[in-house]
Amino acid sequence: MNTKIYRPALTLYKANAKGTGSAMKMELHPAHDQMSGCIMMSLASQKTVGDYRGPNPIYPTFDWENPITVKLDFIDLSKMLQVFRGEYESIEDGRGLVHRSPSGLTYVRLEHLVEPIPGYRLDVKLCDGVVIVEQRSIMLMPYEALGLVAAIESSLGVICFGVPMVENS
């Protein structure tokens, strides 16, 4: 029997007419064996501008070959949920999350905005020491944040405990 395995993912595309938009993909990685689960979050820059005129629209494209990707564990996701739920205006009073990796430091900042447009701004910066090497940002509307809250909350069980399996003996 062939079992097809897929990785659940949610992608939000935020293209604009200037070509400065971005997209965010959140991919669920359940806990297994002795490994904790996580959500791998990738942000990609917009590569091309779309053209919706005429009968054959041209859709914008995104640079998925060069995203900034960060692993969000249970604690990281819990801190993001606190901002989305309105318990805090930002993660760690604006300091955000800091992740160390062989490629440098990655900073993740999430803040609630009221003006000029209500929503949430998510910034991810990859730094080599103190120099910012790459940076991606995405603006999330309140309804997108609401959906993300539901998606993250429903993922926490498998992030913590994995997918229950019955072992055939």
Show the residue positions of the predicted features.
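Positively charged, low-complexity terminal tracts
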Residues: M1-S169
